[in-house]
Amino acid sequence: MKLFVGLDVSSEKLDACFMTDDSTCSVLKEASYGNSQLGASQIKEYILEFSQKFEIESLVIGMEATSLYSFHPAMFFKEDLELNQLNLMVSVEQPNKIKKYRDIFEENKNDQIDAFYIADYFRIQRQVNSIIKEEEYLALQHLTRTRYQLIKQLVRTKQHFIENIYY
C-alpha cells in the first residue's frame, strides 16, 4: 500500500492530507501544522505511525511549488533518514497543474480541500521525481537574479541620464 501526503504550503502553516491508495482511497487524517521544523516533525511522526499501522510500502509527499515556503519542508522530508527507509519520493509540482486538476471538481476552495486535491493529484500517478534544488544552486539562482535586476536598473539609470543631457 502507498501513502500519499498532500501538503498545501503557506507562509505560516502546512495543511496536510494523508491518503492511501487502497480501494476506498481512505483519507487517514487531515490537519494543519505550523510551517516550521516542529510542524514538519509532527507530520513525520504521523507518517511513521501510519507506516507501522498500515504496512506502507512506499511514500509520496507532494506539494505545490510556492517560492521559498515549500523549500524548507521539501528539504526536511527529502533528507530525513527514517522517511527514506519507506521508499520516499518528495515531489514539488507546479501550482497551475494542480489547479487544473482541482478545477475538474466543482468544490469550494480552502486550505484543507487544497491539501486533499494535492494528495489525490499524486495518488493518480501524476507524480514525477522532481529535482529539489540544492543549496549551492539556490545561491547561484539568487545571485543570477540579483545580477539581472542590477543590469536592468543600470540600463534604466543610463537612459534617464541620457534623456536629461539632451533635453
Give short role names for the model-derived ranges.
Residues M1-Y167:
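Phosphate- and other anionic-substrate recognition elements at nucleic-acid/protein interfaces
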